[in-house]
């Protein structure tokens, strides 16, 4: 399978495809899909023993501020297998900067055709407050024990802000 052949979404920016690299609640291992080989590589064993609070991946054929595809956290009732592509709906964005520059994370839920569990979630604020705190806490701290690495959380944005970031990254990819 070639992730480069997968479009960014079915109905951008409301209906996106996300290639999952790290499942929710998984061991503290950072996986990355290599953009040249489409293979799932172990990027590193995380020094901080924390797990991703939601499935983590990227939107194919996008280019974010950090030079990588746009990152997405997909909240699901079960962990999604790495390498899978899930159809999702953006509900918010976590703006942050790290040692590599701007590194925003789109927050999404499964498309309504995949699950009715999130049909009433239109904005990130419709998700449980504890989950939002867990996401923020994870990204504030997951690099704490890695020398020279840091993260600064700049705040949350709504679904419109997430959709704007998606379109910006799609246009940046097109060049």
From Swiss-Prot:
Pfam families: Pyrophosphatase
One term of GO molecular function: magnesium ion binding
Protein's GO biological process: phosphate-containing compound metabolic process
Residue positions binding Mg(2+) 1: 66, 71, 103
Subcellular location: Cytoplasm
InterPro entries: Pyrophosphatase (IPR008162), Pyrophosphatase_sf (IPR036649)
A cellular component annotation (GO) from this entry: cytoplasm
Gene3D superfamilies: Inorganic pyrophosphatase
Catalytic activity: diphosphate + H2O = 2 phosphate + H(+)
Family under the similarity heading: Belongs to the PPase family.
Full protein name: Inorganic pyrophosphatase 1
Gene encoding the protein: ppa1
